[in-house]
UniProtKB/Swiss-Prot annotation:
Keywords: Antimicrobial, Disulfide bond, Fungicide, Plant defense, Secreted, Signal. One of its GO terms (biological process) is defense response to fungus. Belongs to the DEFL family. The keyword Disulfide bond applies. This is Defensin-like protein 259. Residues 1-25 form the signal peptide. It comes from the Eukaryota. One of its GO terms (cellular component) is extracellular region. Coiled coil: none annotated. Disulfide bonds join C60-C76, C66-C83, C70-C85.
Amino acid sequence: MKNASLKLPLLIFILVITSNLGAEARKLTGVADVIVEGEAASPQYGIIDENDTLNKSPSCKRDIDCTFQCRRGGFCNLILQKCECL
């Protein structure tokens, strides 16, 4: 029973020590600075590339074009000339 009672505090101690070592290593190598710069350039901040494949939708001129280009059908947004897939 003594072994079971010591396992949890020992595990927590090891996790705290290793996480602190990882933080120190990131500071020493400068990786922490790169991570901050990468977060500032993420799509969350409104930077949207028109050539990004995740933001692409098929172009169209009428609804029938979207019927064939979307898996479950869709309709054509005439203003943007893009398919709105369902």
